[in-house]
């Protein structure tokens, strides 16, 4: 349909038009939801032939593809923007200047949802904690919907009329247009620089993330990260998490005289860290966050601990792949920012440090204008070898060196994962090698060499398996 035809159609159909901008999975869910509610709906997308266009309801006949139609947006009663579309887009900015409401699918969801919402955001670990809380709820016998920025679009959860609890992961892109989410419990797990190309600076990023607390009935706070603390009433119910012994009623870690670490609630030891399948100090924080969120959502503690003990984590998130010649291999391809990589290096590094072991870290890709020098202290403490891949590898090395990287850390420019594995064989063959674990945690986007972090992680795992085969043949 041409722009002129679209305008004529609007004149005939009248006002109240809902315009969906962006036809990804969330945009498609919005289009279906609004059409089912009886709204007049139009869809516009930058792509000439969006892959999901043939899945739109037949009742939506206003479809403007190839560019976001500024004229169409000016006719809207409300615009529902997909997470991948920036508010700075010229057509969107013009619509906002004309006082046309611009919201996300999450705004529609929270307005329509009649069950308690557990809302989770953060720079890292969102998917892990969201999945874990969802599993805890399901294992406790609750009919739970899990979605948002993970898997199922939030609006699609509403089709389950038996749903008793919604657990949703939210990105900063989804939150920047949300008002008064009204969650039963909300949390910002952690904050580190990410998506600054979209939000402008840390202030803009922080403001977007903290919209999750609007209207919340209770909150969970990470004591180790001041940027997660919301500006809410002191009377609002809250629980906190951290790496040290907690105050009464809160979550933390207790280490006994023998050096054994336990998840704890107040002075009560809940479970030994050794009994968990997910490893690393960062995952102990994730486990605490899930327990705290679950408690404030009304889940029973014993059931949550049982689920936690069985939880093996998610693919591409500090995922154990194999042990070859005594060296453990971990796939953290989802580590696409420096905060995530800091957590992975510190979390796993602390596991191997007592045995005088070091990590070999594979780093690089598209750097997203991050300050990689912030990684240097963590690398100095836990890493003996850094292998760089991807288009920004030279710049990342320069950042690390300028930030006081230790001379004891060896750096290798490898460009590709394949070259990195050739270097791994050389490095680990040395009798002087301290490497006890190889960690892919790139701190970068993957689109310079792969079609996403999943493809990058899968390639890493393939190369590990190939290396294992070679190792087995050498032993036979």
Swiss-Prot record:
It catalyses: UDP-N-acetyl-alpha-D-muramoyl-L-alanine + D-glutamate + ATP = UDP-N-acetyl-alpha-D-muramoyl-L-alanyl-D-glutamate + ADP + phosphate + H(+). It is an enzyme of class 6 (ligase). Keywords: ATP-binding, Cell cycle, Cell division, Cell shape, Cell wall biogenesis/degradation, Cytoplasm, Ligase, Nucleotide-binding, Peptidoglycan synthesis. Its EC number is 6.3.2.9. One of its GO terms (biological process) is peptidoglycan biosynthetic process. Gene3D superfamilies: Mur ligase, C-terminal domain, Mur-like, catalytic domain, NAD(P)-binding Rossmann-like Domain. It comes from the Bacteria. Coiled coil: none annotated. It is found in: Cytoplasm. ATP binds at residues 122-128. GO terms for cellular component: cytoplasm. Pathway: Cell wall biogenesis; peptidoglycan biosynthesis. The keyword Zinc-finger does not apply. Pfam families: Mur_ligase_C (PF02875), Mur_ligase_M (PF08245), MurD-like_N (PF21799). One of its GO terms (molecular function) is UDP-N-acetylmuramoylalanine-D-glutamate ligase activity. PANTHER family: UDP-N-ACETYLMURAMOYLALANINE--D-GLUTAMATE LIGASE. Cell wall formation. Catalyzes the addition of glutamate to the nucleotide precursor UDP-N-acetylmuramoyl-L-alanine (UMA). Belongs to the MurCDEF family. This is UDP-N-acetylmuramoylalanine--D-glutamate ligase. It comes from Psychrobacter arcticus (strain DSM 17307 / VKM B-2377 / 273-4).
